Every structure is written in C-alpha cells, then in structure tokens.
Amino acid sequence: YMRMRTGRQVSGSDNIDAGGAAYGHDQIYDHCSFTWGTDECFSLNNDKQPKGLYNITLQNSILGQGCQNHSCGGLVQTSDKEGVTIYLLTIKLVILR
C-alpha cells in the first residue's frame, strides 16, 4: 500500500513521474495510487537497458490525474519480449455541481 503524490516542483525538472520503473524484473505494484505527476503518473520504460524490463505486474491500483496539460495517467514502452500485466478496475467518476 503506497501513495505517490509528486506535485509541482519548486526547482529542478518539470517532468517527474509519480511512479514506475525503467529497468528490472519480477516486480508487483499492488494497491498503490499514483497521482499528480508532472509527466506521467506511472510509466514502464525499458530505458534501453541490456536486460530490459520484464515480468512487471500493476494491479488493484489507481492512476490518477497529472499536474500538467501534457500529463497522462500511464505510459508503457516495452519490447515484444518483455512481459507486463496490467489489471485495473475502471471506475467512472461523476462530479455533480
């Protein structure tokens, strides 16, 4: 159970993900929430590492809103040899005014 809320930065890079991985294997992200990233809220990118990024599971988690106009909930960039499993429940949020 982890909550990641990046938020706007006072100094430094404006493109920060709330969570994710650039390399590694056999990782499970379960019951996590990722919001307020200034780039993506959660990203998986093999980052051109020799061993890549594989056997990654994201489940029962929330990918929320980003802080910038270009921010997106998630970004997954892997090669066809790598295994990524994403299991998310889709919930429609209605805001009444």
Briefly describe each language-model feature range:
Residues 6-24:
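Extracellular beta-strand-rich solenoid/capping regions of secreted or surface-exposed proteins
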Residues 10-13, 39, 44-47:
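Short, surface-exposed recognition loops or helix-turn segments adjacent to catalytic cores
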Residues 1-6, 23-39, 49-75, 80-97:
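Right-handed parallel beta-helix
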